[in-house]
Amino acid sequence: ESLRDARAEEWLPDYAARVDAAPAEIQGILQLHLAHVYKRQSESWRWGGRKPTKLSDGAATNLPPWSAERIDATLESVFQKVLARAEDLRTCRVEDWSVLVDKGHLPTSYRPTLFDVAVHDMLDFYGRTIPDKTLEKGCRLLDQRMAFHRTDATLDALADAELARIRDLHAFEHVPS
């Protein structure tokens, strides 16, 4: 049976444990892939996809709880592990890892490294799940990304980061208090 056919709650906890045990050199890449998997699964469960079954307490001890809140907490934890490997991700070109990581719909020059993809994903996550943290964490992430691209030969990635900053600040202004 392939992983696509298996229920995620059956293989995802084991995969997450294997990612945590992987060599340090590939931790950032695998953690980013794990975040993409969790995000994809949570979207499926939230928007009418197949929801995990309830298990007895004994069987559930090895599985993460699949409530929206717990999935968000798990994603937050995975994204923190991704961020801890930011230096490694800055050296990983998106083209080299496109099998594992979805680069999005923009040209690669806008998000040329896995660090750029990770920051984009984190901003999307924080804006969707933790509105009161969007400005604080988002500005820090965007500042890091902009500093990383200030000396690039082209301005595409820097412009993408600046546009993200404007979009996020505009969205933050319109969050009801």
Named regions from a protein language model:
Residues E1-S177:
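Extracytoplasmic/secretory-pathway proteins
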